[in-house]
Amino acid sequence: MTAQNFLAEIGTEELPPKALKKLATAFAENVEQELNQAGLAFEKVEWFAAPRRLAVKVLGLAEAQPSKQVEKRGPAVSAAFDAEGKPTKAAEGWARGCGITVEQAERLATDKGEWLVHRAVIEGQPTKNLLVGIIDKALAGLPIPKTMRWGDKTEQFVRPVHTVTLLFGADLIEGEILGVASGRTVRGHRFLGEREFSLDHADQYPQLLKERGSVVADFNERKALILATSQEKATALGGVADIEEELLEEVTSLVEYPNVLTAKFEERFLAVPAEALVYTMKGDQKYFPIYDKDGKLLPHFIFVSNINPDDPSKIIEGNEKVVRPRLTDAEFFFKTDLKQKLEDRLPRLETVLFQQQLGTLRDKTARIEALAGEIAAQIGADQTKAKRAGLLSKCDLMTNMVFEFTDTQGVMGMHYARHDGEDEDVAVALNEQYMPRFAGDTLPNSLVACSVALADKIDTLTGIFGIGQSPKGSADPFALRRAALGCLRIIVEKNLPLDLVDIVAKATALFGDKLTNKNVVDEVVDFMLGRFRAWYESEGIAVDVIQSVLARRPTKPADFDARVRAVSHFRTLDSAEALAAANKRVSNILAKADIAIGEIDLGVCVESAEKTLAEAVIALKGEVQPLIAQGDYTAVLDKLANLRQPIDAFFDGVMVNVEEQTLRQNRLAILSTLQNLFLQVADISVLQ
């Protein structure tokens, strides 16, 4: 079967830059899904995305669906004809449904008898007849939170649609998509190249669009060009461009034909903390800052223009002119804020509610101060510094800089604290209290900062759960899931000896009578432990491993992690499957036990297999206790793995529930002791 390349381009007005890539990849995925559902063979689907277009190109698309042979079985021959050999109504109805007569039906012999059967070949439809519907469905399935109408049309899309180009090889696929008739026309750049022109063949895309329309339709090509040119220009200035992936993709989504340029700002602005300058350059202007080899901000920046004049000086001057007022504002806010110490802003925190039932930000800082001190004492941090950082933790929220540039909270607190002469550990903690801000983010460096970060997050978790506002479904307005995972990461990765029950109980006490949920401690701890699952799954750890540890509910996160790592290792051992099954069997036997179970008595043992297992269990009980005390759970399970043979021999040769009570009690005691050895690490019976 011959194949052709197929092009579908949807020409629109400017698409939302932060959504462009997601829309384009979803479009390609949907097209691929629809092609598969239609049974159309193809090699691969390529996607293209620029500010005013979404496109897919299907390579090697078959020109028709494959023919299908269908077999439709009818009634049994015995039921298809009456005593006189005439077709019954059942047979005639079935034949009519197949579009044949009963006489035209074939017969199928099986070991259960003979049946009427109709076999036919259904010819596949030409691909041309299916493509409009495929593109229509693919567009309808795009993740568009808010659609719009335009002109007098009833159709809705993310932005108004002006052109639809559908080409299968050299053939135009006629039809209507989103109220627009398909054609060969594509539109070029708004200011460069040809405004619009026609394509003769799908294979001309995207090269002809670049040559005649001055549009680089390939998103990844534009992205690579911007990245490489930006790095070259930064190097030429003796620096390194700060190019974050998210901003790079947003800038890529804003331009059709990227022109990377550099500009500068006055050196006097470098007296302002770099974070504030960078915030406005990246967030407001979509510029890439440049740093020197020592990490200091240079008075230059990179921007990407969508036009490419012979003399770019006017564009450069324009961007310098635009950014200057924003940097001047930052300079003014910084100088104004320095006139008042952070500590002097504490009274203003009393005017800002943290949460109506939980009090003001001043109330929160008092709780953070106290809880940070408690945590510091347990992890070996300086209590005085931790409490001081907790007290000042939210003061920068009352500054002009943070009010205007909200993402600078924390980091501006650090700069202002340094200016005020605060201890360096205190100053750094004001910035690091918000870490980790997102998945994969760095953790607080110092133990003082860890104390404040944990205190802040646990105070929020305890307070919100304490008034009955735990996250429901996907809604999480206080970002409690992120806070819980952040706490776990800090405690585990820093190996801190903290118990969640203890910390949450202390946090609860600091709220006084504000909390209404009597089960707040258990609910917060269970919620936090539940976040382990998402974390470990992302690391590729099996769900049953996590569940085996959760079944024991260890409330020290570092200890929890050690158990998970140990069980994950145990699961790779040859004896793991058999021991997991044995633990299930032991669990079932003990659950049905109707007599008291005491200690093992070797003198009661009768069979050699039960004595061997009893001796092994007693010996291991003594061996593993020091290892459990050290938290070396991997070594514990390695030792217990040696029990496979005596356990197998026990179950092969010993009856547990015998009539003689003393013997039965002793055998149950052997199994109970065995089970408890494993349960000191995890519930191995949960493993699949």
Curated annotation (Swiss-Prot):
Catalytic reactions of this protein: tRNA(Gly) + glycine + ATP = glycyl-tRNA(Gly) + AMP + diphosphate
GO aspect biological process, one term: arginyl-tRNA aminoacylation
Root EC class: ligase
SUPFAM superfamilies: HD-domain/PDEase-like
Stated family: Belongs to the class-II aminoacyl-tRNA synthetase family.
Subunit structure: Tetramer of two alpha and two beta subunits.
Name by which UniProt lists this protein: Glycine--tRNA ligase beta subunit
Lineage summary: Bacteria, Pseudomonadati, Pseudomonadota, Gammaproteobacteria, Pasteurellales
